[in-house]
Amino acid sequence: MLITDQDGGIINDPILLKLAEDHFWLSIADSDVLLWARGVAACAGMDVTIREPDVSPLQLQGPRSRDILRAAFGDEPAELKYYRFMEYDWNGVPLVISRTGWSSELGYEIFLRDGSKGDMLWDYLMEIGAPMGLHPGHTLSLIHI
């Protein structure tokens, strides 16, 4: 989806996840979309609560991401269709896994609902993914792939 200003300029291109009938997540790349959403809700007189979720997102992007995700979490998350998501229990750690990402490649976003387990998840994925070529990257990595 695109969030635009009154002149059609792009503010952000977030992913919207509908976790329940009355519970949505707006996963943003950057910017002040939280403030924008609060402003829209207040101006429209909506009876909603808008807050930043306590999650830690991790991107798993690239041509081997499905293989790595399958090795880490099994077939069901690895076979998610584009722009779909699922909630997943990883050894008692709640995750939301979506088939989305910023790389224009095959990819997934893993939202860790317990940020204190971030190091554990990172180490686990790096251990499983290293033999398949997984390494830390960032947006500038794309120009070198």
List the predicted regions and their residue ranges.
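A conserved active-site cap/scaffold subdomain adjacent to cofactor or substrate pockets
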Residues: 106-122, 126
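Conserved small/polar residues in nucleotide/adenosyl-binding loops
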Residues: 143-145
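A common structural junction motif
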Residues: 41-49, 76-77, 125-136
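Helix N-cap motif at beta-to-alpha junctions
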Residues: 29-34, 63-65, 113-118
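Residues forming anionic-ligand binding surfaces in small-molecule and nucleic-acid pockets
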Residues: 10-20, 50-51, 94-107
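Internal amphipathic helical hairpin motif
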Residues: 1-12, 65-95
